[in-house]
Amino acid sequence: MSITVNQIVLHQLVKNVDGDSIKMESVLRDELLSITPEVEQMMLQLHQGYQNKAKAFGVFQEKSIFAQHLNRLLEQEIEFLGFSQYSTKLLADELGKYNFVESGTLILCQYNFLATDYLFIALLDSRHSMLVDEHLDIRRTEYLDITQFDIAARINLTDLQVNANSNRYLTFIKGRVGRKISDFFMDFLGAEEGLNPQVQNQCLLQAVSDYCDQGELNKEQTQAVKKQVFEYCKGQLSNGNNIKLRELSDSLPTLNEQPFVVFTEEQNYGLEESIPPIRSTLKSLTKFSGSGKGVTLSFDAELLNTRIQWDPMTDTLTIKGLPPNLKDQLQKALKSEN
């Protein structure tokens, strides 16, 4: 699949330190980049890399300055270059409040992918390396790192314009622990948290469990339904698609003459029609897992009360029939002790 780059520009943010004072200065390009095959290939790589990142959803606050200028851009009141220059200065002012941010190249690109318009914004690092020139001499070079980036956001312009009540038109990369990347980028955009995929996935799991309970299913039947839900969600995840609530409901058995989607609506679970799947959360549909105090356990839910017994009084698990590789390790350890 390819993308269509409509407008793209690069600006630089340079960090200047004067004693305890930190200032981010912007070096602005005075014209847009020409859209060449190299530029399109770069944006395709950035698009694919962003798709694989862990992201959070956001929405613009009512007084967002960035959103006001974005709206002027979409209404064709200002040009993309002017919008990008203003946004760069706005980000520079915000970055000056943090001491962990370094210099970088800011890329702003308006592109189309699968009939959807996007605005992509990312702060990219530069890396130093070596190259061999035509005379076979070694020279130092500097290149833009488009494979590793964690300061980026993307706005679904199509969704923003078509659905004013959407809570997922803006996504941004979740910051690493100990760094407030998400914080300053949200402040720069004038945005706040929108859809929470983790909460949506957890509510979906609870709804499935409650649906089975109200249908008075036995253990085996409940596990079969949960496995069916998991297989559907896993398929959506593998294909890069969201969980479609009505589509999922159509694939499940109707319990007490009530489809699953109707049950979720009547019980007010607050589920979206389209839910971004989270693999780690969905695994609990078919597995029990946990770790702590040097122990990590994971096993299929159907094994509980068959091969695996839990005694809540003594807080112990009894496993009948260890995995061969684990058993082999234990036997070797026992022999070495003797």
Swiss-Prot record:
Its main location: cytoplasm. It is found in: Cytoplasm, Nucleoid. It comes from the Bacteria. Keywords: Cytoplasm. One of its GO terms (cellular component) is cytoplasm. Belongs to the YejK family. This is Nucleoid-associated protein CGSHiGG_07705. Coiled coil: none annotated. One of its GO terms (molecular function) is double-stranded DNA binding.
